[in-house]
């Protein structure tokens, strides 16, 4: 319950900033704009549609980067870190609350983005073709991949945020990560058809292992003694 209350506070603080809302809407609209502006899109192969659907699901998840980047540094600069650490809440509940505050809104944005893309793609490519390419199972897989993406980015950026001296430094790191995400998603379109299934499965397992490592590090860094020592 305490973790959920902390997550609620994180979400309210994150989206009380108008810039955060504008950034989220831009990331939702970007894949839709690209398929509408691409004149050759109507005759594109199914892989083309899947790539843009993947981008539609993953790009809004990048909002999690900024939320996670300020998780420690922002608390320190706002002088709310000590009261938080002094509150009757366990270290694991702090980590869980922060992580839920990162994952929940980004996952919701991914759902909205995928559904919006589905509607726009149906208009562009035809409802019958989109219903076949983006069937419910594929949409669920895209959403699951988005959640994994959010968890991975959120966990590791939270770890980095706990080590930097200021929120500005954390935001700069978040910007670099976001730029890498955009470049990586753009590169997918040229190699997606050549990636073996076994390699994809191995990559997913490696990511899950890295998530566990990041969560363990985050829990250690949010330990009261560790956190107070860095103030």
Q: What are these model-derived regions, one by one?
A:
Residues 16-40, 51-64, 108, 176-188, ...:
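Hydrophobic alpha-helical transmembrane segments of multi-pass membrane transport/permease proteins
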Residues 1-24, 231:
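Aromatic- and glycine-rich beta-strand/loop motifs that create alpha-glucan
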């Amino acid at each position: 319950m305490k973790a959920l209350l902390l997550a609620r506070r994180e979400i309210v603080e994150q989206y009380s900033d108008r810039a955060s809302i504008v950034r989220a809407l831009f990331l939702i609209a970007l894949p839709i704009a690209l398929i509408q502006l691409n004149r050759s899109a109507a005759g594109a192969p199914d892989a083309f549609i899947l790539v843009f659907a993947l981008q539609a699901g993953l790009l809004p998840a990048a909002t999690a980067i900024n939320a996670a980047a300020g998780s420690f540094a922002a608390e320190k600069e706002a002088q709310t870190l000590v009261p938080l650490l002094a509150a009757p809440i366990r270290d694991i509940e702090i980590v869980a609350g922060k992580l839920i505050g990162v994952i929940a809104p980004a996952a919701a944005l991914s759902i909205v983005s995928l559904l919006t893309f589905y509607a726009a793609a149906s208009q562009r490519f035809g409802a019958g073709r989109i219903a076949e390419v983006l069937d419910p199972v594929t949409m669920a897989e895209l959403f699951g991949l988005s959640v994994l993406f959010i968890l991975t980015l959120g966990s590791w950026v939270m770890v980095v945020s706990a080590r930097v001296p200021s929120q500005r430094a954390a935001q700069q790191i978040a910007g670099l990560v976001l730029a890498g995400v955009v470049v990586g998603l753009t590169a997918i379109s040229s190699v997606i058809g050549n990636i073996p299934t076994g390699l994809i499965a191995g990559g997913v397992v490696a990511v899950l292992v890295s998530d566990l490592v990041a969560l363990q590090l985050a829990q250690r860094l949010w330990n009261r003694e560790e956190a107070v020592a860095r103030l």
